[in-house]
A protein has these predicted regions:
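Gly/Trp-centered helix-boundary motif
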Residues: 1-267, 271, 389, 406, ...
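Short juxtamembrane loops and helix-capping segments at transmembrane helix boundaries
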Residues: 298-305, 395-427
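Transmembrane helix boundary and interhelical loop/hinge segments in multi-pass membrane proteins
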Residues: 342-351, 449-456
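Transmembrane alpha-helices
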Residues: 253-267, 363-395, 442
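Generic hydrophobic transmembrane alpha-helix motif, especially the helices
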Residues: 234-238, 242-244, 255-272, 278-345, ...
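Hydrophobic alpha-helical interface/terminus motif in multipass membrane transporters
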Residues: 273-277, 307-311, 339, 352, ...
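Transmembrane alpha-helix boundary and packing residues in multipass membrane permease domains
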Residues: 57, 275, 305-309, 327, ...
């Protein structure tokens, strides 16, 4: 057994230990529920990028028209279906003059030919006598003549097959046109013989048109042959020559107005209805929820048509008001069910019983305790309701039951772009991309909010 030697205490051994207040201090202030939710939302990159996109869309819709002050209904007939970044230069020419069928110097030749340089003012054609035909028919196409002999649009027919001329002024734009002069027999049927000519059309403008559109401040120095730049359209124009960027901005106002107003109203209605049903409980709750089930079973499209009839909306008239009413009347049950479930759970909590013992009435319990504690569910529901309303508006406008032309909306613009999808795809791509980005951004933000507001994931 080891023996410990005796130790004689010293005076310094009885000196009190140093007390450090920092050891027992709070490392960081306690976060509130909303502060912790915001921290977790910022940590979610997809949700944060979606939030930035949504803010950008709001700025695009609200501030964009103030910066890009172009009338969305104004038509630029010289730039119809113009693609983004296309050449917008135009040459100055003399005003239109009547043509008697004579060929300009340097354009002599045989067969189907140009009588002078082709431009967007007119394409003037000449041809020689065709002895093997009884009559002739002239076609115009925007595609080369293929093996199926698809000549395109018939623009003129001539009773004789003699030498002739024709002036085409039908909706000419800077493009390549393919003209075909088809020989016909006595019965008016094609003999299978034809002459074809590819014509490159050049954009032109007169000095009076330059002055009228204010393209150049001083037109006194302009001469025939000079070039001017037409109005700028960053995203191109549609089939009527309207600026797509301006229409997207004003269409965003319509789509986002419906996307925010309708969900706000029917979510509020659902919150009030669901909170009342969940708080009262019993038979009243059962009756109220059976009515909500009945509303869910109602067909939305049928009631949309009925509301249009009730509001006197005729063909070609805007159906924004019937659309809002239909969404508010028929879309609230989903929110009511969620809030009812939350209230049924919360009303059994101990702090609710304590509030009752302290004399709190029903209104105080609902407004002070139950609805604030369901705010996370309400915000997530609202976030998911916005893209649903935007997509519903786009779909109804696409089929002609929503916003009617000339009022722009993304859905109606997609419908108009569908007709020119093969030749001018930008008219369909831009509104479709905006619809897709908006719906995707709100859905991703809703996912992020659902995770951020989940109390089980909260840090202390």
């Amino acid at each position: 057994m080891n023996h410990t030697p005796n130790y004689s205490p010293k005076p310094e051994d009885f000196t009190p230990a140093h007390y450090d207040d920092d050891i027992h201090g709070i490392a960081r202030p306690s976060r509130s529920y909303w502060q912790d939710a915001w921290r977790r939302l910022r940590a979610n990159r997809r949700a944060l990028v979606s939030l930035i996109l949504i803010v950008g869309l709001l700025l695009f819709a609200l501030i964009g028209p103030l910066l890009w002050q172009v009338d969305p209904s104004r038509q630029d007939i010289d730039q119809v279906s113009q693609a983004p970044g296309a050449d917008r230069a135009a040459s100055i020419v003399a005003p239109y003059e009547y043509w008697s069928g004579k060929s300009a110097p340097g354009f002599e030749g045989e067969g189907l030919r140009l009588a002078q340089e082709a431009n967007s003012q007119a394409v003037r054609l000449l041809w020689d006598e065709v002895s093997s035909a009884t009559s002739l028919r002239l076609y115009r196409n925007i595609f080369p003549i293929d093996e199926q002999l698809a000549f395109g649009l018939p623009i003129a027919e001539f009773a004789s097959a003699g030498a002739g001329y024709y002036e085409d002024r039908l909706d000419l734009t800077p493009d390549t046109y393919y003209y075909s002069l088809v020989e016909l027999d006595a019965s008016g049927q094609s003999t299978g013989t034809f002459q074809s000519l590819a014509v490159e059309v050049k954009r032109v403008i007169t000095i009076d048109e330059v002055r009228e559109r204010q393209l150049v401040l001083d037109t006194t120095e302009l001469n025939i042959g000079d070039e001017v730049l037409l109005a700028l359209h960053p995203l191109g124009t549609d089939y009527l020559g309207r600026d797509i960027l301006s229409r997207l901005m004003h269409g965003a106002r319509v789509s986002l107005f419906i996307g925010f107003v309708a969900p706000m109203l029917y979510v509020l209605l659902g919150v009030a209805y669901g909170a009342t049903a969940g708080f009262l409980g019993g038979k009243i709750d059962q009756v109220m929820m059976r009515f909500a089930d009945f509303v869910v079973a109602l067909p939305f499209l049928l009631f949309m048509i009925l509301f249009q009839v009730v509001f006197g909306i005729g063909p070609g008239e805007s159906g924004i008001i019937p659309l809002l009413v239909a969404l508010i009347v028929l879309a609230w049950p989903a929110t009511a069910r969620l809030v009812r479930g939350q209230v049924l759970q919360i009303r059994e909590e101990a702090y609710i019983s304590a509030s009752r013992l302290l004399g709190a009435n029903s209104r105080y319990l609902v407004l002070r305790h139950m609805i604030p504690n369901t705010m996370g569910v309400i915000l997530v529901t609202l976030t998911f309701a916005v893209p649903s309303a935007i997509f519903t508006e786009a779909f109804l406008s696409f089929i002609g039951m929503g916003v009617a032309p000339p009022t722009p909306s993304w859905g109606s613009m997609s419908n108009e772009g569908l007709a020119t999808m093969l030749t001018h795809p930008h008219e369909l791509i831009f509104p479709s991309v905006f619809i897709s980005i908006t719906v995707l951004a709100f859905n991703l933000l809703g996912d992020g909010l659902r995770d951020a507001l989940d109390a089980r994931m909260r840090d202390v």
